[in-house]
Amino acid sequence: MQIASGGVSDVGRIRTDNEDCFRIVAPLQLFVLSDGMGGEAHGEVASALAVETVTKHCLDSRENHATPLFGEVQASLSDQTKRLASAVHLANKRIFEAAEGHLEQRGMGATLTAAWIDGAKLSIAHVGDSRAYLLRSGTLQQLTSDHSLVAEQVRRGIITAAEAEESQMQSVLIRALGAQPEVEVDVEEHTLFVRDILILCSDGLTRMVTEPEIAGTLQAETNPTRAAEKLVALANEYGGADNVTVIVIRLEPGSRKWFSWLRRGARSKAASNGSGGGKLDG
């Protein structure tokens, strides 16, 4: 299979800082997205630390299988999924320790959604309310579960999905990186097929753009970066209430070759204002 990918991050229409962060590591077929929280730029610190830690741990463990695993990892999982879950556990540890060690960073945290592809095998690791979707044969399937208060209330039948969309508690998370010394990491393993499309996104997209609109955009635009740009533009057109980050991954017929594009609507973390963004490793 041939894989094409692209990512876009934008500050939105309301916020002044971008606390989202993402990274595409093309040679490793690794995609990582994080949405920081904590205010006063500390959300940016948390999301950047999450993405950096997960990426480095996956790289290290791929090169050296003796790299120790962190956290509780199911024995039945593939080695790749174990390494990815371990990376997220380590990211939680790093963020928690950073917050505990710096008074001004107390309370910072982050979501984390990562996808790692090896041939036709997909590993997903997830904490928080950023999402991973799979579009297959015109049907959009959410691969992750939101770790938010309203999502839990919907699962328990306390409120309806429609009520959740109107709730003022949508931003309240019940699970995030850095909140506790240990975190439960959701993992998924899937088999991919030619013409599958994956999308990772922060809640700045899913709170503004409907799933049918997401699916329609992915089907209409074959260039992954332009698809991501169009989804970000839709979120901003509908109000841009939050930072919005989108990674699109297309599995296409052909030789196993990488084509990756990256554009950012927000300035990179290297810029003077420290706003969020993304990075492509190719």
Residue ranges and their predicted role:
Residues 1-282:
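PP2C/PPM-type serine/threonine phosphatase catalytic domain
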